[in-house]
Swiss-Prot record:
GO molecular function: phosphatidylinositol-3-phosphate binding; ubiquitin binding; zinc ion binding
Compartments, record wording: Endosome membrane
Gene3D superfamilies: 1.20.5.1940, 1.25.40.90, 6.10.140.100, Zinc/RING finger domain, C3HC4 (zinc finger)
Keyword Ribosomal protein: no
Pfam families: FYVE, UIM, VHS, Vps27_GAT-like
Alphabetical GO biological process terms: protein targeting to vacuole; protein transport to vacuole involved in ubiquitin-dependent protein catabolic process via the multivesicular body sorting pathway
SMART domains in the cross-refs: FYVE, UIM, VHS
Domain VHS, residue spans: 16-147
Keywords: Endosome, Membrane, Metal-binding, Repeat, Zinc, Zinc-finger
Protein name per Swiss-Prot or TrEMBL: Vacuolar protein sorting-associated protein 27
Native source species: Aspergillus terreus (strain NIH 2624 / FGSC A1156)
Keyword Transport: no
Lineage top rank: taxon: Eukaryota
Length: 556
């Protein structure tokens, strides 16, 4: 009798099968999320179906329903996220957490808190999902204990869904007006409106969760079939139309193709890295194992993997070539060293101590490879790292190098400090040496400029000064005549032992002249000659003795 008044929808039946108390059916969960994303069912209806399933008293059913809800949130599209973030659904979760009569199962409660926290962190910055963050903050203030936070990107909630339909009075391709005979048709791929002539093609849209052939316009049909032809190698578009159901795997989204190509290259690189890491323990040079060449593929159009991952392959090949060149150079250097070393003098050969904390080229290459893989995984879906256990093995092998790397870094820093100390000492020594050179040069120059010595003997120098008249007015008159001064009225007599007061003035002038002019031998001899001539004039010598050597008497 109850079946006459209530009938379960197909979605309710699928939700009931997916949330049964048995093991989780991931394939059925993804199928339900595709139905929601393709808008085959209304998002509010799907939300209420999950809400009713959470009212079940069986903890296993509740856990399965929460997992199904999380799968639909991540793959159901924006229109379903808006229903999950509504007050109707979030307040129902809060009421289940605050149940007083019958205590909620511990695992169910922890799973609810974990999902609310993850959804709130992923929905940060989105106004249409703000109620999830408000609910999360309110539960924190009320004292609910959430699990440790995990960094979740907002891209977790991004999934492709069919676009909203756009209305128009004319066809958006041929601009023909719609009428009673010319009806409107919407393209499921772009959401624009067309007439029957411009939208007569049908295609499945797996990237939008639509696996059955649906109506698309001519422009979208050309784009999708051209991509399918490049990925599957088909040249005829009609063959894809007739076999669209059986060959729907060829219409995978671009992200899936890129992920497949990345997995193959990643697996190949990890295998080579692990082989090198296993061989690093043996002593001596270990040649790199030759990679078995794959059989040549039939010539044709390039596959999607080669198109999407050409940069990654080129980087891996360049890295392998560099490693091979380094190993060949190392082997050649070892061979030359062995050939040049005489075999009959083993006691004279000395080998440099090898640093036990120095990283080998293979270890350095593994570190660079792991860094490149981690950087590449940041742009991949979250589940990529879980499908490749080789990454964990590479991480463990690199983790053992951390003490070695730290010790090597410490020794390098100590060497750096030692070299800086030596550099400062060397700079100080060079500065002292330069100062000593400057002091010696200055002292030598001063001694050479002050100590002229005696005038060498030889032919007399020509008299560049005019001869004194025979009736000179004494020594003062000769001095005045020499310097061009006026004649003193009271000249000194021969009996006066006092020297004229102009002599210090003359000496200062001679010193100034020596300081201003450069050091030249002819000028030195001329200056000495003029000085001796003046002294002879003071002593009353005749004018004919001006060119003779100076007297040996001490001049005051």
């Amino acid at each position: 009798m109850a079946g006459w008044f209530s009938s379960a929808s197909p979605l309710d039946e699928q939700v009931e099968r997916a949330t049964s108390s048995s093991l989780e059916d991931i394939a059925l969960n993804l199928e339900i999320s595709d139905l929601i994303r393709s808008k085959s069912v209304q998002p509010k209806e799907a939300m209420r179906s999950l809400k009713r399933r959470l009212e079940n008293k069986n903890p296993n059913v509740q856990l399965a329903t929460l997992k199904l809800t999380d799968t639909c949130v991540k793959n159901g599209g924006t229109h379903f996220l808006a229903e999950i973030a509504s007050r109707e659904f979030m307040d129902n979760l809060v009421s289940l957490l605050k149940t007083e009569g019958l205590q909620l199962n511990t695992e169910v409660k922890e799973k609810m808190l974990e999902l609310i926290q993850d959804w709130a962190m992923a929905a940060q910055g989105r106004m249409d999902l703000s109620y999830v963050g408000q609910t999360y903050q309110r539960l924190q203030e009320e004292g609910f204990r959430f699990p440790p936070k995990t960094q979740i990107s907002g891209s977790m909630l991004e999934s492709s869904a069919p676009p909203e339909w756009i209305d128009s009075d004319v066809c958006m391709r041929c601009r023909t007006a719609f009428s009673f005979m010319n009806r409107k048709h919407h393209c499921r791929n772009c959401g624009n409106v067309f007439d029957a002539q411009c939208s007569s093609k049908t295609l499945p849209l797996p990237h939008l969760g639509i696996l059955q052939p649906v109506r698309v316009d001519d422009g979208c049909y050309a784009k999708l079939t051209s991509k399918a032809a490049q990925s599957s190698g088909l040249s005829d578009r009609t063959s894809f139309k007739n076999n669209s159901i059986t060959k729907s795997s060829a219409m995978e989204p671009r992200t899936a193709r890129a992920e497949g190509g990345f997995d193959d290259d990643l697996r190949r690189a990890l295998q080579m890295s692990l082989e090198e890491a296993q061989n690093k323990g043996s002593s001596g040079y270990v040649p790199q194992p030759k990679v078995a060449q794959e059989p040549p593929k039939p010539s044709g159009q390039p596959t999607a993997e080669e198109e999407e991952d050409a940069d990654l392959k080129a980087a891996i090949e360049a890295s392998l070539r560099d490693m091979e060149e380094h190993k060949q150079k190392h082997a050649a250097a070892l061979k030359n060293t062995t050939s040049e070393t005489p075999s009959h003098q083993p006691q004279n050969t000395t080998t440099l101590p090898k640093n036990p904390y120095e990283l080998s080229p293979v270890e350095v290459e593994n570190i660079h490879l792991f860094a490149a893989l981690v950087d590449r995984l940041q742009h991949q879906p979250p589940g990529t790292i879980l499908r490749e256990p080789q990454i964990q093995e590479l991480y463990e092998s690199i983790g053992t190098l951390r003490p070695k790397l730290a010790r090597s870094y410490g020794e390098t820093m100590s060497k750096h400090d030692t070299l800086l100390d030596l550099h400062s000492k060397l700079s100080t020594v060079v500065r002292y040496y330069d100062r000593m050179l400057e002091e010696r040069l200055s002292s030598a120059y001063s001694q050479h400029s002050l100590g002229y010595g005696s005038i060498p003997s030889g032919p007399g120098y020509p008299n560049v000064y005019p001869s004194m008249p025979p009736t000179a007015e004494g020594k003062a008159g000769a001095e005045n005549f020499y310097y061009g001064n006026s004649v003193v009225e009271n000249p000194l007599t021969a009996s006066n032992p006092q020297y004229p007061q102009a002599a210090p003035d003359m000496m200062s002038r001679e010193k100034d002249t020596h300081a201003r002019r450069p050091y030249e031998p002819q000028y030195v001899y001329t200056a000495l000659h003029s000085l001796s001539t003046t002294i002879l004039q003071w002593n009353g010598a005749p004018a004919t003795d001006l060119h003779s050597p100076p007297p040996s008497a001490n001049v005051p």
